[in-house]
C-alpha cells in the first residue's frame, strides 16, 4: 500500500491566519491565545463540545499534526489526553475494543476557514505480545512476564504530545514503510505503551520504544537504514 502526501504543515499554522482584525471569539467560541502582532489574527476553529457532523469534539486536546490532504484542504490530527480513571471515560469502558484516549481527525477548508468534517481516527489497533514476540488483535496477555497479570487492557490512557512524520520518513532505498505516521504514547507511568498510527487509523504498538511515561515520540527525519526516535518522559515516573 503506497501513501502519497504532498506537504506537511505545522499544526500551529492551521490556527493562525494573517489579517488585521483583533483576536476575538467566533460565535460562542472562547479565545485562548491573543496575538502580540497586529498583523496576525488568531481564530479558534473548533473547541471542546462542538458538534461536527455526528461527532462531539472531546476535551483535553494535546499533541497534534497536520498535512495537506491533496483535496484542497488540511487534515489535522489531535490527541485527547483522556485518562481511563476519569469518571466520564469509564462509562465507555469496554472489554472488546479500545476506549479512553482517542485521536480526532479533522478536515479543514482554508477557503471557508472552517472544519468541514471530524471523525475518530481509530480503525484497527494491533497490540504487541512481549511473550510471543508477535502482534495480536487484543492487548490481553501481552504484558512482559515481570508485569502484573492483565496489566495491559483495552483502555488507552492519556495520549500526550505527538509527532506527525510525512511519507518518506520511514523508507530508505526501497526498504521500510513509505507512508506517513502519527506517533504518540501513554503518559501513565512505567506501564505506558507507545503507538504509531497511519492516516487510515490503523495503529501499532511500538515494543522497541519500551514502556515509560511518554511525553512524545519524535522520529528523526534523517534518511538511513535505521530509524532513530527521541523520547522524553513525563508524568510521575522517575526511574525508567
Where are these regions (language model features)?
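Gram-negative bacterial Sec-dependent N-terminal signal peptides
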Residues: 1-24
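Conserved small-residue
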Residues: 24-240
Amino acid at each position: 500500500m503506497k501513501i502519497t502526501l504532498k506537504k506537511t504543515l505545522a499544526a500551529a499554522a492551521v490556527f493562525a491566519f494573517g489579517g488585521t482584525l483583533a483576536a476575538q471569539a467566533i460565535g460562542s467560541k472562547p479565545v485562548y491565545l491573543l496575538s502580540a502582532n497586529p498583523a496576525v489574527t488568531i481564530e479558534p476553529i473548533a473547541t471542546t463540545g462542538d458538534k461536527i457532523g455526528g461527532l462531539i469534539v472531546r476535551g483535553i486536546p494535546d499533541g497534534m499534526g497536520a498535512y495537506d490532504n491533496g483535496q484542497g484542504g488540511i487534515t489535522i490530527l489531535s490527541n485527547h489526553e483522556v485518562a481511563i480513571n476519569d469518571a466520564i471515560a469509564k462509562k465507555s469502558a469496554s472489554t472488546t475494543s479500545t476506549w479512553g484516549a482517542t485521536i480526532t481527525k479533522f478536515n479543514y477548508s482554508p477557503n471557508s476557514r472552517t472544519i468541514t468534517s471530524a471523525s475518530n481516527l481509530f480503525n484497527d489497533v494491533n497490540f504487541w505480545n512481549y511473550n510471543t514476540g508477535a502482534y495480536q488483535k487484543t492487548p490481553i496477555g501481552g504484558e512482559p512476564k515481570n508485569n502484573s497479570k492483565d496489566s495491559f487492557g483495552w483502555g488507552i490512557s492519556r495520549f500526550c504530545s505527538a509527532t506527525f512524520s510525512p511519507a518518506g520518513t520511514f523508507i530508505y532505498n526501497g526498504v521500510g514503510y513509505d507512508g506517513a505516521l502519527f506517533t504518540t504514547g501513554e503518559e501513565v507511568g512505567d506501564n505506558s505503551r507507545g503507538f504509531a498510527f497511519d492516516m487510515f487509523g490503523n495503529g501499532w504498538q511500538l515494543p522497541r520504544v519500551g514502556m515509560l511515561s511518554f511525553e512524545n515520540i519524535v522520529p528523526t527525519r534523517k534518511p538511513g537504514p535505521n530509524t532513530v526516535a527521541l523520547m522524553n518522559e513525563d508524568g510521575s515516573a522517575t526511574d525508567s
